[in-house]
Amino acid sequence: MFGIKYSIIELRSINYGDIDMKNYYGSLCTEMYEILHKDAPEDELDFYLSYTRKDMSILEPLCGSGRFLVPFLERGYDIKGIDLSKEMLAKLKEKSPNAKVFQSDILEYDTVEKYDYIFISSGSVSLFTDMVLCRKFLKKMKWLLKKGGKFVFAVDTVANRCPDDSDYRTAIAIKTKERYDLILKNKNYYDEKTHTQFSPGIYELYKGAELLQQEIMDFQTHLYELGELEQYLQDIGFTSVTVYSSYEKVIAKNNHTEMFLYECSF
């Protein structure tokens, strides 16, 4: 996100029992992301589209503001989305009022429907820094998937580690459509033991020198090494797990890439 080692992470929200609401995306964060990254990157969109057929039922958990879901709808696919953030889903509905999306904790999403294809783009699975919750989440994805279907997702790797900072600094400063100044200040700390990248941020909206609104975000990501997830995915029932290092589906061989792309089926 925002060109400071966040470029891979899509703007989505998770909660799943985290009472401090870490990684919850509020209105200022949503507005900044929509200005900077309104559309899905073409190569990434093409990668996720490559798994589709028009007769598929598709689910995008953590769908955010719809950078991927809306282009899928525009191409005629039967797709549904889930996200916790009402701010993000409001943006999505502005783009596609008839989109089938649900504001929900995915672990509490109650449905009998199974899907042919489930995808989570842009490294958003890395937002789960509690590995117990992450495993529950992945198990839920397997439960929602039809036999023979595909579950495809991306995670950030240890190559995305940021240098530690002692103080907050201005990382992004942009103008809104009202010509207000929207500023992000952040700092970084990496926990070697847990592979957690902590990047707390402060979003501020100014009209001249007047502070109109401030929003604090406890942004955290888990940075993966190759081999960290594969065994668990097999343990929960996926019989085929392939790991790529690029949208061209090059097989991952080491940690010298900023993302891993997982293709799972059973």
In which residue ranges do the predicted regions lie?
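A short acidic, Gly/Pro-enriched loop at the edge of an enzyme's catalytic core
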Residues: 110-118
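SAM-dependent methyltransferase
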Residues: 152-227
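Conserved class I S-adenosyl-L-methionine
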Residues: 12-64
